[in-house]
């Protein structure tokens, strides 16, 4: 039976490249001349540091653009509130990887409500979808792409016939 997996992942190496490119861009931008600002990537957390709050917003836009250019969906970013202390401001951005249990249940529920002839199973941090025909699986993908919402960055992997 044909099947595929629904996951929410990103390439960590591409994320590292995006952070490096963002650092290079803010070092050469005119509006960041003479300003101490940087991005640091530790695990799945990117820390933005600048002198004032509005620079963090500009840096966040730069980071978002670089992630998109490197093929990482911007919806995987969990943006924390900026923290200002004295002459420094910093903000953390967590790059989310893997589907949580409520998100998996929501995907399974949407597939069942659509009355497609597919079965969905939760397997850890991914959802396996099986069906008798490849066309049914393509309908399931189209359904999830149309109403996945702005909060989920979904990828479809491990196609089997």
Curated annotation (Swiss-Prot):
Gene3D superfamilies listed in its UniProt record: 3.30.70.860, YajQ-like, domain 2 (3.30.70.990)
Pfam families: DUF520
Family indicated by similarity: Belongs to the YajQ family.
NCBIfam families: PRK05412.1 (NF003819)
CDD domains: YajQ_like
One cellular component (GO) term of this entry: cytosol
Protein name per Swiss-Prot or TrEMBL: Nucleotide-binding protein Csal_2524
UniProt keyword list: Nucleotide-binding
Domain of life of the source: Bacteria
Function noted in UniProt: Nucleotide-binding protein.
Protein's organism: Chromohalobacter salexigens (strain ATCC BAA-138 / DSM 3043 / CIP 106854 / NCIMB 13768 / 1H11)
A molecular function (GO) term: nucleotide binding
């Amino acid at each position: 039976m044909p099947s595929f997996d629904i996951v929410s992942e990103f390439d960590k190496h591409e994320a590292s490249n995006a952070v490096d490119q963002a650092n290079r861009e803010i070092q050469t931008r005119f509006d960041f001349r003479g300003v101490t600002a940087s991005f640091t990537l530790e695990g799945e957390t990117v820390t933005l540091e600048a002198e004032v709050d509005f620079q963090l917003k500009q840096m966040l836009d730069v980071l978002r653009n670089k992630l998109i250019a490197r093929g990482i969906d911007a919806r995987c970013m969990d943006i924390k509130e900026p923290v200002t202390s004295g002459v420094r401001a910093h903000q953390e951005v967590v790059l989310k990887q893997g589907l949580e249990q409520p998100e998996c249940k929501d995907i399974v529920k949407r597939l069942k409500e659509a009355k497609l002839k597919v079965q969905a199973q939760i397997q850890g941090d991914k959802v396996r979808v099986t069906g008798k025909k490849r066309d049914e699986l393509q309908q399931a993908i189209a359904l999830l792409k149309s109403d996945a919402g702005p909060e989920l960055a979904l990828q479809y992997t491990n196609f089997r016939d």
